[in-house]
Amino acid sequence: MSYLLPTIITTLLILLALIIWFYVKTQTLRTQLQFLSEQNLEISNNNQLLNQEQIGYLQKIEQLQCKIEYQAQTIKDSEKIREESFSSAKAALFDLGQDLSKQLIEIHKMENTAARELAEKNIATASGKFNSEFERLITMVGALNKDIEQSKGTVDLIKQSLLSPIGAGLLAEITLENILKSSGLRPNLDFIMQYGLTTLDSGKLRPDALIFLPSGNLMVIDSKASKFLVDKQDNNMSLNKTMNYHLKSLANKEYAANILTNLNKKDQSFNNVMTLMFLPTEQAVEKVIAADPEFLQKAWGCNIFPVGPSGLMNMLSFAKFQITDHRRSENYKVIIEEVRKLLSSIGTMADYSQKIGNNLHNMVTNYDKFAASFNRNFMSRVKNIQKLGIDSGNKAMPATLERYQIVSSKSEIIEVEAENPPQIAEKL
């Protein structure tokens, strides 16, 4: 009996799965049937409306027929009255009345034919629209069913990818790269992704990210993930084993010694290396701590700091502040030198402007002297010559030249006490 128990349990589980699948399939088909029933009801209502319109058109046709019959009867009665009244009339008048009657009958026949053709055309148009809408609904239902099947396959594929070790690792690396790009740090200057290096024993290491901090500090980030972190089932033992293996392998890599050796060969001086184990979600950090409460103590003992996205963002914000402050302090001397050059340029410009002002002053003074001499000496002689009878022709002589004077004044300089002058003096 003991060996039949697993078989029975397996059979029951299979039956339960089949029942659940049958139930879900039944609910899906029931939903589709309800949707088709509603569509069929709507189509039936449209068909009833079309039938009512058809009945209305038929009634109008019958009314027109009755009207035509009534008019025909009236025409016949009028013909009889004419025959009785104008029996003694001339044959020409009788022929004329008969022709008019025929024309009226033909007109009424044409009106009846046009009305019938219009009604048949409207009915055919409505029937065509109904058939096209019904075919469109059937096509939409088929396409919707196909899309549902494709979406189900896509969801299963994504789920299988996330539950695989490679998929979980790629998820952690993508999350890390997105956080670094949104942190404000400069790629290939403040941080490097997927930095490859060779160890002392010719081994290959490839940390996910290196962040260069001021004062010879370096932050190494290595993302770790496991399918048990994204799996909803409780696999604490497997998760504990996997994450402790990651911690051991990360500690055995000796990032600090290998990275310092590798970077010092490239004329880059780093003194302190801090290693971060990045987990893709905060829930992953909580699951690791729940699986092994001593995991953080073990990691800290190896100088490794497990962090999630929130913890990493906090550390990156502090790192960005340090990098920005260090960059500002490095650029301080350059800024002072540029300010000195600017002040020197201002002095040179002031010298040139002083020379230009002096030249303008000399030009205006000399012009004023010339205008005074011209008006006083030259123009007086010209007037004397004109008095003697010599005309200047069509060109009118000016009375006097306008004189100009330039006024120079010294600008007042308003002195303002500088804030914290001792500190500025110390920096300069």
From Swiss-Prot:
Disulfide-bonded cysteines: none
Protein keywords: Coiled coil, DNA recombination
Top-level taxon: Bacteria
Coiled coil: 25-84
GO biological process: DNA recombination
Pfam families given in the database record: RmuC
Sequence similarity: Belongs to the RmuC family.
Its biological purpose: Involved in DNA recombination.
Protein name: DNA recombination protein RmuC homolog
Organism this protein belongs to: Rickettsia conorii (strain ATCC VR-613 / Malish 7)
Gene: rmuC
